[in-house]
């Protein structure tokens, strides 16, 4: 398509001097950078973004109710946002996942990681021959039909299931959606394989898309620390860390979660891998409360895995989240035997690695223990971070030796 045959998109005009982030190819335009919208645009509709003098900068999606007024689809003026566009993006992303899946023997991985794969607001996880779709932005929802058509072209043998039932959609004025899109319904529990483990995934009712693929490498790394050790697995969900700890030869692993359904699946995962169920304990409880009870009763562990849900959704919550992370890590440090290992994580995008490391250091001081940082973690390689969007590095973690 030549430029002369392009549709005339509405134009989002930026205030003077507010184009710098787009010139650096950051994919978001915040409300404070906007001067005006020329023309009419529906929620999620494609718009052109220009500087205060009318110079073209990018093409994106309009979201008037969000602090992120526009999310960029492309920095190429000659690129139209259509089925062919989504097909190109999918095939580009698949090249890396094909190599990774073959290299690591994976049957499940993140196929599309939003902005880092050039598709802002789009998350797609692949579990076997099921594609699980999450559309998190107005632009992604507006392009639903084109995206699904591209998926059917690229993956004709895969079923597509929608898990766009996340609260963040409400911020952009969208309803929550869930259900089959094409093909068969996923089974209640779908078995996948990960580094020698067999794990059951609840696509329809589980957290997010059903399973935390981003922690794959951290689960594998756990095995080097747990041989003949007593392990506490906090916020255990369906037991991926527990199964990995048992495969690493731990003496005992105690998994704690507030969801009985998740703990039941964790138990099934231990059995599915033919591991010694007598070494696995499953506790339904609040982690903060249980850690305090363990401290009062003098319980001790050799390894503690701390993988909490996101504590912070926006900048106004950051200080409170810092206190929460410090308190829970302080409790964990107090429960570790000398020489014990704390594997601790944060999946909050607003929590930088440097800030998280400082929080762990402060927690150690409050616990009256010395801590050595011995290993650093991040999301698995199927969750890439494009250089112009550092916010994409949301998962960070540390292995700490507690003296």
From Swiss-Prot:
Gene Ontology terms, MF aspect: RNA binding; rRNA (cytosine) methyltransferase activity
Catalytic activity: cytidine(1962) in 23S rRNA + S-adenosyl-L-methionine = 5-methylcytidine(1962) in 23S rRNA + S-adenosyl-L-homocysteine + H(+)
Enzyme class of the recorded protein, top EC level: transferase
Annotated PUA domain residues: 9-88
Domain of life (superkingdom): Bacteria
EC numbers, comma separated: 2.1.1.191
SUPFAM superfamilies in the cross-refs: PUA domain-like, S-adenosyl-L-methionine-dependent methyltransferases
Keyword annotations from UniProtKB, A to Z: Cytoplasm, Methyltransferase, RNA-binding, rRNA processing, S-adenosyl-L-methionine, Transferase
CDD domains for the chain: AdoMet_MTases, PUA_RlmI, RlmI_M_like
PROSITE patterns: PUA (PS50890)
GO cellular component, one term: cytoplasm
Main localization (coarse): cytoplasm
Subcellular location field: Cytoplasm
Reported function: Specifically methylates the cytosine at position 1962 (m5C1962) of 23S rRNA.
Family: Belongs to the methyltransferase superfamily. RlmI family.
HAMAP family registered for this protein in UniProt: 23SrRNA_methyltr_I (MF_01857)
Protein name: Ribosomal RNA large subunit methyltransferase I
Lineage: Bacteria, Pseudomonadati, Pseudomonadota, Gammaproteobacteria, Enterobacterales
Name of encoding gene: rlmI
